[in-house]
Regions:
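C-terminal catalytic "cap/lid" subdomain
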Residues: 1-195
Length: 195
């Protein structure tokens, strides 16, 4: 499955004490943070949702499930098929797309603090996007660690399912689903799901 191989460095794991010397840890800190209390950790894409059966049961019972916040807890299987936690960060947007795909959802909503995705964000040429295809979005540039992961997640979901994705403000969730607000992302009319 795409996204299961390799890792990229992202974020910081904040420790309660100074980073021990000699462990080979890379150090990184956001602006204003103490470098001796942070270290770089890898960011990975989830390969599977371990609790999928439980989530399917809840959804089929009519329960509104809010999950994969923060991306989930990164674990690996050892040679005895036991799960162990690893020091990594799982991308929450890609995890949401994976879960929506595995649940065979019709739509993926990514709720954020802005009303729309903007082409050219932060420039005088910035313009809100309302209806756009995954292919059109892939031709644009977005800020890494901000809108780019949401765009990638939306595109992966759409390419896998043929469903729709929407990105916009939390308060606009029902309108996002109807296509009345936010950025609605669809598959190109010539692309079948899974293509």
């Amino acid at each position: 499955m795409r996204g299961c191989k390799g890792a990229r460095g992202v974020g910081c794991g904040h420790l309660g004490a100074d980073v021990p010397a000699g462990r080979g840890w890379a150090r990184a800190a956001p602006a204003g943070a103490r470098l001796d209390r942070a270290r770089a950790i890898i960011g990975v894409s989830a390969c599977t949702i371990i609790e999928l059966a439980a989530l399917e049961l809840l959804v089929s019972s009519g329960v509104l499930v809010v999950c994969v916040g923060g991306g989930g807890i990164p674990v690996v299987l050892d040679q005895h098929q036991r799960l162990h936690g690893i020091e990594a960060v799982i991308d929450k947007d890609l995890s949401a797309a994976l879960l929506a795909t595995q649940l065979d959802a019709d739509a993926l909503l990514m709720l954020t603090d802005v009303p729309n995705v903007e082409a050219g964000w932060g420039t005088p040429q910035a313009r809100p996007l309302t209806d756009v295809t995954a292919d059109e979005l892939r031709m644009l540039k977005f800020a890494p660690g901000s809108m780019a992961p949401k765009i990638e997640a939306a595109c992966r979901f759409i390419e896998a399912t043929g469903g729709i994705a929407a990105i916009g403000a939390l308060a606009d969730a029902p309108a996002l689903l109807r296509g009345d607000r936010g950025t609605r992302i669809t598959a190109p009319t010539s692309s079948p799901p899974g293509a």
